[in-house]
Design a protein with these regions (language model features):
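Primarily the internal scaffold of c-type cytochrome electron-transfer domains
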Residues: 33-41, 57-85, 108-399, 404-456
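Bacterial N-terminal signal peptides that target proteins for export
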Residues: 2-18
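Conserved, well-structured interaction surfaces
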Residues: 100-108
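Outer-membrane beta-barrel channel domains
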Residues: 95-100, 130
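Aromatic-lined, polymer-binding surfaces characteristic
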Residues: 91
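C-terminal motif of bacterial Sec signal peptides marking the signal peptidase cleavage site
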Residues: 25-27
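Bacterial signal peptide processing site
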Residues: 29-31
Length: 456
């Protein structure tokens, strides 16, 4: 598989400046009594400096959407168009999360010059996360960076290393404090005041934010036993995956894309519980479909839900012939473009100041949401315990002999992408790489062999 030129740099130890590389490699294998060779702040800001001691975490991160954040062609296209349409007034709204270190160091003010910057300034880097020592707000990246050279993490007793290290609850996936750090960028409010991305807010309102429940990293950074660093005296302990899959995937050749896709599919397959009931009703035969966001720690879908689409595909057959269909969408066809009065699509709609629907998020002044809520309580006596959604579909007579359903999803849909292509902000070749996922756990099939009943 081809990888981008930037990630050939990330994944090659020889991309380190020769002197810096020698320093780090020497520092990774001292005796227990040797004083470590300390890295400078400038060296710590370069992810390549992390590779010799943290090879596994580095390679996972290098194939992550965090590393890809400023290279993503849709981000580049939307940021370019946003800056043009707002005459630069949007400033760091996008790049503040997609290349935050470059913003903090004054290397960019709007993200339009990212292609000219060194790789160490691009994406969400190791230093940016591990130098964070406080969260000073709830959205649009209010993280505070320390300048003391201490790399913070979730290990309470770090060993000697080429940098100073300290425990931080913000970096401990067992601590709910860590969710506030993730939420700093995974909640976005536009200049007109619309809360367009609400993943942290959704988690905060869910069962998972309660004491003893799960922070973001428990799902998105799987744990395993291993060494956190290849330094003398480093014990085997619980470490976690830095590939951080969710639903977005690289749309250009990129290192680790296959692993990223597999991680996404694993999460999606374990998100929903579904039920398909085919019944005889007073009005005829109906299909009742229930979708339950049982296991995501936020709504489904989440994040940039004005651009995401998840939808139900429901098809009925009689004698092998299709007699009813809803949600059957062709490749590269926008879900909302199909004529389908029964379409069940999960998404946000955004509206500008004139109350006109827009898919350009920076114009958004308000949001209408139709997403599946996360679990809010584990108490079956609490009315909020029941949060699934059921819809009923009238089926044609005579009754079908087979009915199938599945839930499909796109991280971005083609109404937005086609628009970006039409303004020449996005290369049309990117559209061929946009995935359509199928949630494996959502597939259900009813046949008349067992009579009218529910399948779950």
């Amino acid at each position: 598989m081809r990888v981008s030129s930037r990630h050939r740099q990330w994944l090659s130890g020889i991309a380190l400046p020769l002197f810096a590389g020698a320093v780090v490699l020497a520092a990774c294998a001292p005796s227990k009594s040797d004083p470590p060779v300390m890295l400078t702040i400038a060296q710590l800001q370069d992810p390549n400096s992390c590779l010799p001691c943290h090879a596994d975490a580095f390679r996972e991160w290098a194939g992550s959407m965090h590393a890809y954040a400023s290279e993503d062609p849709v981000f580049v296209a939307m940021n370019k168009r946003m800056q043009r349409e707002t005459n630069g007034q949007a400033g760091t709204l996008c790049v503040g999360c997609h290349a935050p270190l470059a913003v903090r160091l004054g290397k960019t003010k709007d993200g339009l010059n990212l292609a000219e910057l060194p790789a160490a300034m691009k994406g969400v880097t190791c230093f940016f996360c591990h130098a964070t020592d406080a969260v000073e707000g709830t959205h649009n990246n209010p993280l505070r960076l320390a300048t003391d050279g201490i790399m913070r993490g979730g290990i309470t007793d770090p060993v000697k290393a080429p940098h100073r290290a300290a425990y931080s609850s913000l970096h401990d996936r067992e601590s709910h404090d860590s969710a506030t750090m993730c939420g700093a960028c995974h909640d976005v409010v536009t200049l007109p005041g619309a809360h367009v991305e609400r993943t942290f807010d959704e988690w905060n309102a869910s069962l998972y934010a309660k004491p003893g429940q799960l922070a973001c990293g428990k799902c998105h950074m799987d744990g395993r036993d291993g060494q956190a660093a290849a330094v003398a005296g480093a014990p085997v302990r619980r470490v976690h995956d830095h590939s951080m899959p969710a639903v977005d995937i690289a749309l250009t050749p990129f290192s680790g894309a296959d692993a990223q896709r597999a991680g996404i599919q694993k999460l999606l397959d374990a998100t929903l519980l579904t039920k398909l009931c085919v019944k005889q009703a007073a009005t005829g035969v109906v299909a009742e479909v229930t979708l339950d966001n049982a296991f995501a720690g936020h709504k489904f879908p989440s994040g940039a839900a004005q651009d995401r689409r998840a939808w139900l595909e429901l098809v009925a057959y009689r004698g092998g012939a299709q007699v009813f269909a809803s949600g059957v969408v062709a490749d590269k066809q926008a879900v909302t473009s199909i004529v389908d009065p029964n379409l069940w699509v999960l998404r946000d709609k955004t509206f500008d100041a004139a109350d006109k629907e827009t898919h350009l998020f920076w114009q958004a002044a308000r949001v209408e949401s139709e997403l599946l809520s996360a679990a809010a309580t584990a108490d079956p006596q609490d009315p909020a315990f029941f949060h699934s959604v059921t819809r009923t579909f009238a089926l044609p007579l005579p009754a079908p002999d087979r009915v199938t359903m599945r839930v499909r999803m796109r991280p971005l849909d083609f109404d937005l992408l086609d628009d970006l292509v039409s303004t020449q902000d996005l290369d049309p070749g990117v559209l061929d790489r946009v995935p359509t996922y199928e949630l494996g756990g959502s597939n259900r099939e009813w046949t008349n062999a067992g009579g009218f009943r529910c399948v779950e």
